[in-house]
Amino acid sequence: CVDSDLIFNRTIDIFKDGKPNFFVSDRDQHHEPYFNFMDLYFGLSRQVDHTFINDFMIFDKNICAKMIPNKDHLVLAINAFMSDDCLLSEFETYGNYITKNHPDLYGSQLTKTKMYGRYSSEPWSGEEIKQIVDENRTEDVDLFTIHSWT
């Protein structure tokens, strides 16, 4: 899964020693509503002291199917629980689930990141995006995001 507003600034090795990597951001994100949903729906707490949110991740669809045997039930729960205090993050949920239940399945790799963002009421122009890409081409960052928030 790669978010559409993510730009890779250099080659990233997805696998190491035959295992997929979790990519650990140098940004600290601890958005409590994500952990509230994990606890309510999955009975799962935060397992690590870093975020799994890094705008891209390799998901094992077989594990996802075990985590979510009834997709319709999950959608109903998201709609029922969703509030400013309770939100789903697929990255936090999957990363913490794997860490708890399959701790040797993934490796990890630190990434240097940079984030640009603004509200969608002020859309990015093609020229602005090109300028950000050009400015970061020589920066010591692995990836950067150009978010539009609603």
Regions found by a protein language model. Name each.
Residues 6, 98, 148-150:
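Short, flexible loop/turn elements at secondary-structure junctions
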Residues 20, 55, 90, 140-142:
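A generic secondary-structure signal marking the coil-to-beta-strand transition
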Residues 28-46, 130-150:
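Long, charge-rich low-complexity segments
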Residues 1-9:
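Short beta-strand-to-loop acidic/aromatic patch adjacent to the donor-nucleotide binding site
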Residues 9-84:
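Conserved catalytic core of nucleotide-sugar-dependent glycosyltransferases
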Residues 23, 95, 142-145:
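Ordered hydrophobic segments in well-structured contexts
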Residues 50-133:
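Catalytic core and acceptor-binding pocket of nucleotide-sugar-dependent glycosyltransferases
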